[in-house]
Amino acid sequence: REETEFRPKSMVKIGTKPILWHIMNHYAHHGFNQFVLCLGYKGEVIKEYFYHYMLHNNDVTVKLGQDRQITIHENNQVEDWEITLVDTGENTLKGARIHKIQRYIDNDFMVTYGDGVSDINISNLVDFHKKHGKIGTVTGVSPRSSYGQIKQEDGKVCQFIEKPKIEEGIINGGFFVFQKKIFDYLNSNNDCDFEIGPLEQLTKEDQLMVYHHKGDWACMDTYRDSVFLNSLWDKGKAFWKA
């Protein structure tokens, strides 16, 4: 049975932590530690994870009986993050989700999906966005092939590469930066999409720039992707690890 029967995709684990934690940790590594999470399908799982974060990540002593007491031993470093968790609707499309968190946004802000990891330099991305002065920036990445690649000479295998990067063409890798003006292109109707409509309109108005990230990127779309990312983590080859 698929893990996403029981939890949102962003809570599927790489190693001992959800992929969502890995994404947030990457932002925090570059000095960005204030987060607003747009919750949808099984959003309560994410709320409970962060509400009980100390319990999940430290040793605990439980005293039973009349003088019941729980002591959490803070034996692990605690992330200095501020997280606002917002219920935006189970079937809401992405544009509407972003519009529904507008009250928590004061300045330029970043947006990413909850299922993609990368070694992108977030600080460089933000600098690029500030310099061009347009409303939005999207990160373009080279996707990985779904299949292993074999290099051969005269029938002899010289190299086997699991899920190599496809060098031709780039795709939307997430990791957006926006001015607050983006909210003028969104609305709170649940059918307000993000890529179809708002980003297309920004493109027509010459208000969307692309930051070409030439490093590594991967997305957890399938169980096979989960196995691949966990294998990188287990081998110490997790390119996104901060």
Predicted segments — roles?
Residues 1-55, 85:
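N-terminal glycine-rich phosphate-binding loop and ensuing alpha1 helix
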Residues 16-17, 91-94, 192:
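A conditional alpha-helix N-cap/helix-loop micro-motif detector
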Residues 19-23, 96-100, 198:
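Well-ordered alpha-helical segments embedded in enzymatic catalytic cores
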Residues 33-35, 133-136, 207:
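Residues at the starts of beta-strands that form the adenosine-phosphate
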Residues 46-153:
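Conserved beta-loop-beta/alpha segment of the NTase-like Rossmann-fold superfamily
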Residues 109-110, 117, 121-130, 142-145, ...:
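Catalytic-core segments of class I nucleotidyltransferases/pyrophosphorylases
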